[in-house]
Amino acid sequence: MKKVVSLAIVISGLVFPAVAQKAVQSKNKSLTLLTQWMDLQSRLVRNSSGIPHVAYSRHFCYTAIAVYESIVHGEDEYRSLAGQLIRLDQLPSPPKDEMCWSAGLNAAYAAMLRYFYASFSSCVASIDSMEKSQEQLQSRYSNETVIKSREYGKQIAATIIDWSKTDGSDNAMSYNPQQGEGLWIPTPPSYTPASTPYWGGNRSLTKDLLTEENLLRQPAYSTDPNSDFYKMANEVFTVSEHLTPEQKATAFYWDDSPNGSYKTVYGHWTSLLSGLVKQHDLPLIKAAEAFAKMTMSMYEAAILAWDGKYKYNVVRPVTYIQQHINNQWMPVIVTPPHPEFPAAHATLSNAAATALCSLFGDTCSVTDDSYIDIGLKERSYASLQDVAKEAGLSRLYGGIHYRYSIAQGAKLGERAAKHVDENVTFHASRK
C-alpha cells in the first residue's frame, strides 16, 4: 500500500494527521464520553469470570471498531474500515441529515458490551447505568435526531457483532496435547488443561497475517547443562531466587490475570490509553482511532502468538526447572494454561506500544495508574516502548517465561502492529 506524506500537526508531543473537524459538540464532553466507556470496559472484566484471557482480545477490538465506525462519517478526512478488513465488506450508512454523533457512540458502545457480557448481571447493570448517564450530551439535539442517531449506533454494533460471530472463535473442538520430551504439559498448582488451543486459527482482520510468524525461531530443546535451553531455564530459576522488591512488584503489576482483581492485558493497555487520551485532550475521532488501532494490533498479535504457542508447544519454566534443576521450585505468579513460546505479554504489549507510537510518537511519556484501586502504585515511563519492555520482563520476574521467548514475542508484536498499519488506513488522504 502506498503511503502519501500529508501535513501533520503536533499537539503536546503527539503526531497525528491534520483533521478539519466539524464543530458538532464540545470536544471535551465527547472525549469524556469515550474515556468513561473505556474505563468501564476495563473494569467489567473483573466481573466476567470464566472467560479465557485471550478471548478479551475480541471484546476490546470489536468494540473499538464499532466505536470508531459510529462516528467516522462525521469527519471528512477519516475513512471507514469497511472494505479494508477481512469479510467486513459493508456497514450501515448514517442518515444524511443532522446527526448527534455522541448518541450514536453511546448506543454502539453499550450494545457491544451488552453482547459480550450479557450473562453477567452486574456487568449489564453497569452498562445500563453508564448509557443512561451519558444522555445529557444529547440535550441540545431534537428528540428525533437523538433517536435516529441512537438507532444508527445500534445498527453499527449489530453489524460488527454479526461479523464477529464468523471469526472462528466459537468453534468447539477437542484437543489432545502433543506428547514428548520438551513439550508443554499442564502446570502446577491447578494443572489446568490447555486453554484456547485453536485461537491461532481464528480469522484475522488483515490479509496474510500469518506470514509474520516467519520471524519466530523456536528454541532448541536440551537438558544438557551447557545448552542454551538449560541456561535460559536456569536464568529463570536464578532470577526468581534473587528478585529485588521492585522486580517482584513488577511481576505482580503486570500479572493481569482475569482473576477478579486485574483487568487483563487488554484492559490494562486500554486503561493506559484512556489516561493518555485525557492527558493530551485529544479530539474524539483521534481518540477513537488510537483505540481501534491499538486493539486491532493486539487482536492480530494474539492470533500470531497463539498460533506459535500450539505449533511449537514449548515447555513452561516450572516444568523444566522442577524436572532438571529444583523439584521444589514454584514461580512467583501462576503460570497460564498454555504453551510457553512466544511470550504473549511481550507480543501483545509490543503490538500495543508500536501501534500507539505510530500515533503518539516514540518519546511520548506516560503514567500508568491502572491498578491504584487495588493498592498498586502508579508507574511512570519515558516512552510507550519502555512500558512494553517492562511488561515483557515482568514475565521473567514472575517465573513463567524465558528471556528468549520474551525477545521473540516483542519482535512478533511489533510486526503485528506494523502489519495492521501497512494494510489498514484510517485517513482519507492515505492510499
Regions found by a protein language model. Give the residues of each.
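Bacterial Sec-dependent N-terminal signal peptides
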Residues: 1-25
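Acidic/polar surface patches and capping/hinge elements
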Residues: 21-431
